[in-house]
Amino acid sequence: MSTLQTLWRSDPAVARIIDGEMRRQRDGLELIASENYASRAVMEAQGSALTNKYAEGYPGARYYGGCEWVDQVEDLARERVKELFGAAYANVQPHSGSQANMAVYFTFLRPGDKVLGMNLAHGGHLTHGSPVNFSGQLYTFVAYGIDPKTERIDYEQVAEIAHRERPKMITVGASAYSRAIDYAVFRQIADDVGAFLFADIAHPAGLIAKGLLPSPIKYAHVVTSTTHKTLRGPRGGIILMGEDFENPFGLKAAKSGRTLMMSELLDKMVIPGVQGGPLMHVIAAKAVGFGENLQPEFETYARQVIRNAQTLANALIARGYHVLSGGTDNHLMLIDLRNKAVSGKAAQEALDRAAITTNKNAVPNDDKSPLITSGIRLGTPALTTRGMKEPEMEQIAALIDDVITHINDDHVINRVREEVMALCARFPVPGLEPST
């Protein structure tokens, strides 16, 4: 009983569930693009005594006493992430990427303001204007998408829509787009129409941080990210700015009358605007994760993530799969399964039975519901954390093809599952041992 020892004694029901999830992660291939394996150090920080501490406010300006240690860890997290991205400002308190985005929208916009964001069906995100999300309910979103031929962002269309609609903000970022984004072009479009540029880099953040993809830091007025995914830290959010600037809304400090900086408005919007007490144990884990990201070996990891994704995409293309845009520049790919006559839901469920975890995903012009979809999204961050490289990607492509080609054949799926478990045994998850 190497882990969860106290939990097995005090609450075996919960211990059993956690142990089952640990075994699932250990014994299966994780290809969900937004998932990764946090280090043991990150998890130790997140499970520390900082869980017990309330710390509303910011370092040096808390509403509670006894914050001398949590002040230090929040300062450390902020300094590390600023160094990582070359940012002048960082807020590490958002509980999630969605709450970071909410704080940005609430700071820069008013209800009903017009925003230009990427179509969810073309690779965008719920918080970029989906009508079922607060963003689409509070603001007037118009969508840009990908070119139907190249399956890449159509920058001419973006400019055309922006000039026609005159949005107050342009949101750039995606959850299922496999190509590098030209933030300089987006900034030029934003400047041409007098819009703020907001970049959500939740998915490629780790690759951007190591200079392997273009960075929006010097182009966007504000940037958000999650801290897991390609950053491989705890689940959480951050807000960044490449440079601070005076707010353009005429807001003044109550006593001095000076113009408030945007950093001050963002800080006030995070707390008390959209959150209360920060999760100090998670902020400590963020600090640990950022420290790991700053090490030279993380660049080696990030480069391998991209090489693995490109190898996997090419191997699937060679087997007749429609990978959108014909490949990938980052950690993920979107597979349109319509030429295989298989739905995303059916593929996901069959792959689950083979211990290959993916997620169904809508594709452009999808005629199926979001609960069914015509595609799946694949990513390589977690596989790369296990130490897998190009040869394993070739093998995994063959296993995926076996399952989808024989989607109703339990014999094939069981054989693939055995191969998956053997492969996983060769590449254990760092720091994740079974508890019994």
From Swiss-Prot:
EC primary class: transferase
Reaction catalysis annotation: (6R)-5,10-methylene-5,6,7,8-tetrahydrofolate + glycine + H2O = (6S)-5,6,7,8-tetrahydrofolate + L-serine
SUPFAM superfamilies linked to this entry: PLP-dependent transferases
Chain positions found as N6-(pyridoxal phosphate)lysine: K229
Top-rank taxon, per record: Bacteria
A Pfam family that the UniProt record links to this protein: SHMT
Site positions (Plays an important role in substrate specificity): H228
GO cellular component labels: cytosol
EC number: 2.1.2.1
Binding site for (6S)-5,6,7,8-tetrahydrofolate: L120, G124, H125, L126
Pathway as given in its UniProt record: One-carbon metabolism; tetrahydrofolate interconversion; Amino-acid biosynthesis; glycine biosynthesis; glycine from L-serine: step 1/1
Annotated compartments: Cytoplasm
Any one GO MF annotation of this record: glycine hydroxymethyltransferase activity
Keywords: Amino-acid biosynthesis, Cytoplasm, One-carbon metabolism, Pyridoxal phosphate, Transferase
GO terms for biological process, alphabetical: glycine biosynthetic process from serine; tetrahydrofolate interconversion
Reported cofactor(s): pyridoxal 5'-phosphate
Classification via InterPro entries: PyrdxlP-dep_Trfase, PyrdxlP-dep_Trfase_major, PyrdxlP-dep_Trfase_small, Ser_HO-MeTrfase, Ser_HO-MeTrfase-like, Ser_HO-MeTrfase_PLP_BS, SHMT-like_dom
Stated role: Catalyzes the reversible interconversion of serine and glycine with tetrahydrofolate (THF) serving as the one-carbon carrier. This reaction serves as the major source of one-carbon groups required for the biosynthesis of purines, thymidylate, methionine, and other important biomolecules. Also exhibits THF-independent aldolase activity toward beta-hydroxyamino acids, producing glycine and aldehydes, via a retro-aldol mechanism.
Record text on subunit structure and interactions: Homodimer.
Record-stated family: Belongs to the SHMT family.
Protein name per the record: Serine hydroxymethyltransferase
